[in-house]
């Protein structure tokens, strides 16, 4: 297998491939790929003993820069349980899966800097994940039937070249390269008497999720389905009930993605350093979730863009 030679302008900035450009603002992507990940790589190499350094300090750095959350963990739990139950045959019953899910949740350490918000969110997710899991299974069954997939297969790793781009494009479809699962969770709220705001199922797929599956479609032109599941039910979208999942629509979305990736490559090429690259984009610190990170890391980002001293 031959690996493509990466251009120096990409290596210098640790921006080695493209992925869905609509998953978060470009400012957050640059900060993560070009600033945070190199620091995490060094910290992990110290912790693993591959590089000399202070292991305690490295562990502290990993904790600070690793931006996990209760909802993200809950989504991974459901995905893992489905893989174990439907694909790898590691669990005999749904009850076994639920017990395994509780063990995974027990390993998660909530954020310590958000006044208990993530800890409260974790309780909500733990109390509802069994229902979300069961509904996700039903939604997956329906999607598998609609897509006429005989044998369910797990996550794939797509890495492919794109005409007009110097860097490859990466995507990881959940099932068979054709079915994407999205779980939605009730949200903790201290202003609601119950302490939680229910999550509804969407009437149409989100733009970000459409862009995500358009990347999978671009690789093999296989039909795509998106399954949404919450604690109350599920909803399956295919081209039968969502025109934006039709081939022509996915092609148009893919063209949009490639255009945005091309703009990023132009920025990466024109900037001599990571600092210059950062200065080429306007940060959106008011984004609803992109900058929900450790206060010290947020301050670091604002300093890079010159918003604070």
Where are these regions (language model features)?
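Secondary-structure boundary elements
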Residues: 143-148, 177-180, 218-225
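Metal-dependent nuclease catalytic cores that hydrolyze phosphodiester bonds in DNA/RNA
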Residues: 1-172
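Non-catalytic protein-protein interaction segments used by genome-maintenance enzymes to assemble
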Residues: 158-212
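Short loop/turn segments at secondary-structure transitions that flank enzyme active sites
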Residues: 84, 185-187, 230-232
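Short amphipathic alpha-helical face segments that pack within enzyme cores
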Residues: 77, 211-218
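Short acidic (Asp/Glu) and glycine-rich catalytic loops that position anionic groups and cofactors
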Residues: 54-61, 183, 231-235
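Metal-dependent nuclease catalytic regions and adjoining charged, substrate-binding loops involved
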Residues: 154, 218-309
